[in-house]
Amino acid sequence: VEWTDAEKSTISAVWGKVNIDEIGPLALARVLIVYPWTQRYFGSFGNVSTPAAIMGNPKVAAHGKVVCGALDKAVKNMGNILATYKSLSETHANKLFVDPDNFRVLADVLTIVIAAKFGASFTPEIQATWQKFMKVVVAAMGSRYF
């Protein structure tokens, strides 16, 4: 993927405003609530049976931060996102057996959470650039599935 300077700047600016400790837990919790079938991957997280339990679950919050930490690596390695996610993709494909469509679901929900947080400043133009970036991340996360 070729990134223009404007796209790189936009993605860095959006990500620079993201509080990983806030957005990560909110995004993962929303995925588990809105798409309940994703809960099957988090059996070791304890109670994820209700929205309140999910929102208050410290393991969900911690993993949401981990997810955003991994996204931070993509922002910092925009020239080689595929290589950046090679190992993570292999783990999700071959050890965790995560349906790769869930990466798209998470990307969409993360975008919704960011848009809700940033409000009108998350313009359609910024969203278009952000979603291009997320599509590249989703493709990289699915790259080791055979």
Curated annotation (Swiss-Prot):
Red blood cells. The keyword Chaperone does not apply. It comes from the Eukaryota. Residues 2-146 form the Globin domain. SUPFAM superfamilies: Globin-like. One of its GO terms (molecular function) is organic acid binding. Heme b binds at H63, H92. One of its GO terms (cellular component) is hemoglobin complex. Keywords: Heme, Iron, Metal-binding, Oxygen transport, Transport. GO terms for biological process: hydrogen peroxide catabolic process. Pfam families: Globin (PF00042). Involved in oxygen transport from gills to the various peripheral tissues. Heterotetramer of two alpha chains and two beta chains. This is Hemoglobin subunit beta-1. The gene is hbb1.
